[in-house]
């Protein structure tokens, strides 16, 4: 390659700082930026949902202990890569589907009516506009309306929790959040088995080796079994990562009990309030007994 770059280097270049970039790379980066924005606008028109949920990057000391947390970089070069990946994933899934080749899809079912009605009721109780049975376009408008406001994190979290979980399956369900009818994971075969399956299917297609029973060409039933397994292992890995991250942060906070923390309310129950740290991204429960001497009454609708 001509030059290896970080997201931060590309971001600085796109903002006018050209010092670290080789001249022959500059036109390519500018073209990538322009193309990504064109793709993003088209996908916005199609109804793609952009959830704004900042990730926390842990800061470690020399001994390997967590000493702080900071917002992970989310500059536009990340979106450039995301747009290109989504295009590649969709293009490959479309080619395989149009040739009737069984393929492992990344599917994201539409939210159920009951959940959407509850979401609308909650959002409307906060003074925000949303139809009683919101569609994807109205959810997109809601997320755009709260972007950059104090309520952004809370609204993005409740929208996320109203969504079904994405999964791996050969079924033709589509991907709701991406507004894509044909979608499969293709761009990360070194870390996801689903991508490797799609690479194998594409390899068979390009070689014209499509006879039934080929080791690299599982049928739909085999794909369904594999899909259930890798969906389970994906969720297990995500849960393990989340739990480890929480434990490391709690170890850091052990000597900070009693200090104030900037949080957002993420849920209410009859026994307390769930809050999430804006900086660290972990969630905890504030029990009613800890809220002071006032009288509190839980109203599930408000």
Model-predicted segments: where are they?
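Conserved, carboxylate-rich catalytic/transport cores that coordinate ions
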Residues: 1-302
